């Protein structure tokens, strides 16, 4: 395994990929626009530059044997050129191109008979109004930007005609709101030989205002039949894309028992961070196994787990201080992971905390305790 590997993106996902690569002494190069990116201190070689500029991505890719990503917002044209020239790019550029545009992603689900919420493609704000005029029963709905939405940004709830000014005046999709009971996720990995391996289904709880994961539980508290369906849909989705690497499949469990795909991510994902401690193979090691065409690892969980996102506290912008970290480290079965970001700002992802316990109900009770024990502030 002496082939050089490049990661497009040097944030926390890249950092955890790097940490997983150390045991195998993989030579990792990283491209990121931020001179203070979390990956900088760990990688073999760091290049500061744009992820969306063709020439920058192309030149970076010429210096490595294998390319992968930690974020979808990259220049796919450059990756396609590198792939044609013989570089190994995983996930494949064709997969990234579909997934980085929510319009193409949703159309892909429809074209491949993968269950998803009803939707209409829109070109601008006027198109949203016209779609609702033709089908008023579509409300309530969400208007989503086709490109560049991330961690809840690029999504607006449209509950009535009075909300139309909130719709984006850009290409997007209008999606009928799902009356869901739970939000689930399954991470699936696939290597070049077509071997597939899924991680246990998790149950995500989203922050009510920020539209990003507040905390999750693994495994999800769902019936065996719902779990079977969720796992099957994740596998079918990975097979439909033909992806090489890790794919996170976010799902809705509706109140009528139906399972619908919300969206997918072609990379390690927030819904799998707990696997670093809680599973035999982490999602990050599994990604390396997949793109290096190695046998996929055992995804069995050691214990039930919870994962809490550690966000910058509202009203605090500046050098980060982790108040309560010592108290947190004294708690049994609690494992904090800090991302090495020097500066905090409101709701910025600064780290995560994994909790493990033999009893899932005990974990549920401890989440609030852990959340109250630590905060990321400025002094």
What are these regions (language model features)?
Residues 1-100, 104, 126:
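ATP-binding N-terminal substructure of ATP-dependent carboxylate-amine bond-forming enzymes
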Residues 26, 289-379:
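Peripheral (often C-terminal) accessory segments that flank ATP-dependent C-N-forming ligase machineries
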Residues 91-155, 161:
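A conserved helix-loop-beta module that forms one wall/lid of the active-site cleft
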Residues 154-249, 253-256:
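Internal nucleotide-binding/catalytic subdomain
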Residues 210-220, 263-276:
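Short, flexible active-site loops
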Residues 228-249, 255, 265-317:
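Active-site "cap" helix and flanking loop/linker of ATP-utilizing ligase/carboxylase catalytic domains
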């Amino acid at each position: 395994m002496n082939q050089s590997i490049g990661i497009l993106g040097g944030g926390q996902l890249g950092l955890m990929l790097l940490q997983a690569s150390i045991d195998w002494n993989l030579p990792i190069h990283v491209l990121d626009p931020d001179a203070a990116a979390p990956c900088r201190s760990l990688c073999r070689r760091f290049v500061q530059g744009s992820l969306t500029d063709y020439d920058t991505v192309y030149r970076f890719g010429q210096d490595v044997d294998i390319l992968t990503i930690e974020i979808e917002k990259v220049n796919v044209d450059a990756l396609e050129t590198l792939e044609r020239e013989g570089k190994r790019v995983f996930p494949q550029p064709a997969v990234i191109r579909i997934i980085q545009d929510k319009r193409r992603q949703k159309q892909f689900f429809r074209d491949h008979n993968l269950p998803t919420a009803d939707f209409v493609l829109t070109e601008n704000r006027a198109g949203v109004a016209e779609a609702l005029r033709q089908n008023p029963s579509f409300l309530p709905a969400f208007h989503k930007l086709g490109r560049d939405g991330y961690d809840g940004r690029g999504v607006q709830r449209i509950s009535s005609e009075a909300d139309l000014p909130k719709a984006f005046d850009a290409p997007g999709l209008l999606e009928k709101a799902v009356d869901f009971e739970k939000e689930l996720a399954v991470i699936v990995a696939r290597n070049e030989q077509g071997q597939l391996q899924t991680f246990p289904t998790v149950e995500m709880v989203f922050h009510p205002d920020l539209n990003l994961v507040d905390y999750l539980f693994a495994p999800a508290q769902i019936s065996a039949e719902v779990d079977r369906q969720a796992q099957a849909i994740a596998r079918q989705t990975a097979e439909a894309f033909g992806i090489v690497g890790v794919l996170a499949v976010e799902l809705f469990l509706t109140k009528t028992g139906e399972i619908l795909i919300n969206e997918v991510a072609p990379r390690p994902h927030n819904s799998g961070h707990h696997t670093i401690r809680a599973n035999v193979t982490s999602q990050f090691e599994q990604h390396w196994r997949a793109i290096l065409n190695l046998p996929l690892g055992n995804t069995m969980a050691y214990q039930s787990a919870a994962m809490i996102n550690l966000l910058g506290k509202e009203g605090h912008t500046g050098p980060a201080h982790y108040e309560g970290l010592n108290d947190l480290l004294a708690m049994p079965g609690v494992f904090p992971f800090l991302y090495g970001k020097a500066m905090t700002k409101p709701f910025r992802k600064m780290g995560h905390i994994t909790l493990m316990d033999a009893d899932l109900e005990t974990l549920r009770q401890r989440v609030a305790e852990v959340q109250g024990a630590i905060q990321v502030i400025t002094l």
